[in-house]
C-alpha cells in the first residue's frame, strides 16, 4: 500500500511502452430487434433475449507473461500462446493476478480497445496479508478525499484502461469497520474513475459482506447489496444454483439493475453448475433464463487444461462450437447464449489478418528472422509482421 500511495503519473515516463495508445472504440448500438438464437421452443413459450453482457476474467497462469510485454517475445518458444479470439462475444475483460494491483499490459488494452471491449484492472486483497492492506485502504488526505480512490483512478487514466474489479477477500482489522465508510470509498472511486476515464467502471466482487466477513453469497443478498448499490456492477461467486440465481434476479430487478449482475462461472469447475470446461453451457443456460449478465473466470482453461494441445480447435469449440448441430447437442458453446457485439465501427471494419504470432518475421516479403515471435497485439502498420 505504501508503493501505491507514493505512485505518481510522472513515474511512468520512462516506461511509455506500458501505456495504452488506443482509446476504447465505441461499438454501434444493437438493432432494436436483435436476432435470437433458435432456442428450443420446449424451454419457454417465448425465448428470452440473449445474455446481455459477458465479462471475461483473464486468470491465466499467474499473469504477466513474456508474450504479453509491449515488445512481445522474440525469439519465442515453439508452443503456441493463449490469445482471446472471440471478442465479439465479450463486453468487459478483466486482467487478473494475485498481486495487490494488477495493471493490464498495454498490448491487451490496445487489442481489446480496437474491438470495443472495456478493460479493467484488479485490486485484490486476500487472507491475513490482505488485512494489512485494508488497514490503510480508507485513509483520507488533507482535503478529506480517499487517497487510494484517487490513486486507483489516476492509474487507470494514466495507463489507459477503463476501471477496476474490486476483490476484497479479507476482513478489515479491528472492531471499527463500518460498511458505510467502505460504501463512501467505493462511491468516490466510481466517481473518480467516471470523471477521468470515459465509460469507466468499478465492479464489486462477491466476497466481503457488510458484517466484515468473507462469506461468498453466490448472488445478490442483503449482505452485499450495499456495495453493489454504489458500484457499476457485481461479479458473483461461482457456487450458485438456480434458486439462488432466481433470488438474485428478483432482488436486482427491484433495484432496476438486472444486467449489472455478472453471474460468475469458473471455467475450471470448482463448484460451478455444469462443472466448467465444455459444461459452461449448463450454467449459461440458467443465467440466460434468469436474464442477468455473465462472467467467465479463467477461460484460459481451453489452453491450460490441455497444455496448449490443439488450442485453436479447443478454444473454438468452447466459444462458438465445432460447426456441428448445436441445437441437437447437449454441449452448447458460449455463443449460443450471449448476444454478439459489433467489432469495428458503425462505418468500417479493418483487419490485416495478422494474429500477432507466427513462425517467423518478414518485412516487405523478405525473411528477417525465422525464430517464432509472440505478442498479443497485431503488428503496427510500419512492421509488416509475422507469417
Q: How would you name each of these model-derived features?
A:
Residues 45-246:
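Chitinase-like catalytic core of GlcNAc-active glycosidases
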Amino acid at each position: 500500500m505504501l508503493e501505491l500511495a507514493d505512485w505518481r503519473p510522472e513515474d511512468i515516463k520512462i516506461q511509455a511502452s506500458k501505456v495504452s495508445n488506443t482509446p476504447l472504440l465505441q461499438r454501434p448500438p444493437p438493432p432494436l430487434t436483435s436476432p435470437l438464437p433458435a432456442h428450443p421452443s420446449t424451454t419457454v413459450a417465448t425465448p428470452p433475449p440473449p445474455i446481455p453482457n459477458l465479462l471475461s476474467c483473464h486468470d491465466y497462469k499467474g499473469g504477466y507473461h513474456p508474450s504479453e510485454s509491449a515488445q512481445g517475445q522474440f525469439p519465442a518458444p515453439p508452443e503456441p500462446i493463449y490469445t482471446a479470439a472471440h471478442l465479439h462475444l465479450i463486453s468487459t475483460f478483466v486482467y487478473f493476478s494475485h498481486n495487490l494491483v494488477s495493471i493490464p499490459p498495454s498490448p491487451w488494452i490496445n487489442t481489446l480497445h480496437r474491438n470495443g471491449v472495456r478493460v479493467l484492472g484488479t485490486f485484490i486483497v486476500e487472507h491475513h496479508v490482505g488485512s494489512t492492506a485494508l488497514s490503510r485502504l480508507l485513509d483520507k488526505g488533507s482535503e478529506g478525499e480517499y487517497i487510494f480512490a484517487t490513486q486507483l483512478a489516476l492509474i487507470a487514466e494514466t495507463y489507459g484502461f477503463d476501471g477496476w474489479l474490486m476483490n476484497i477477500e479479507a476482513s478489515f482489522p479491528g472492531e471499527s469497520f463500518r460498511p458505510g465508510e467502505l460504501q463512501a470509498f467505493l462511491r468516490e472511486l466510481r466517481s473518480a474513475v467516471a470523471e477521468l476515464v470515459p465509460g469507466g467502471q468499478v465492479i464489486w466482487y462477491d466476497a466481503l459482506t457488510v458484517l466484515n466477513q468473507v462469506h461468498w453469497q453466490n448472488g445478490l443478498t442483503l449482505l452485499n447489496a450495499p456495495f453493489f448499490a454504489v458500484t457499476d456492477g457485481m461479479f458473483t461467486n461461482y457456487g450458485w444454483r438456480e434458486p439462488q440465481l432466481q433470488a438474485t434476479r428478483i432482488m436486482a430487478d427491484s433495484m432496476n439493475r438486472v444486467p449489472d449482475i455478472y453471474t460468475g462461472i469458473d471455467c475450471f469447475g470448482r463448484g460451478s453448475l455444469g462443472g466448467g470446461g465444455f459444461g459452461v453451457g449448463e450454467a449459461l443456460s440458467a443465467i440466460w433464463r434468469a436474464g442477468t449478465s455473465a462472467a467467465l473466470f479463467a477461460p484460459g482453461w481451453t489452453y491450460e487444461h490441455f497444455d496448449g494441445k490443439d488450442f485453436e480447435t479447443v478454444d473454438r469449440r468452447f466459444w462458438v462450437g465445432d460447426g456441428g448441430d448445436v441445437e441437437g447437442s447437449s454441449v452448447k458453446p458460449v455463443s449460443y447464449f450471449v448476444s454478439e457485439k459489433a467489432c469495428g465501427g458503425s462505418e468500417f471494419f479493418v483487419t490485416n489478418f495478422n494474429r500477432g504470432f507466427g513462425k517467423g518475421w518478414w518485412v516487405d516479403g523478405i525473411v528477417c528472422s525465422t525464430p517464432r515471435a509472440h505478442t498479443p497485439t497485431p503488428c503496427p502498420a510500419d512492421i509488416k509482421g509475422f507469417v
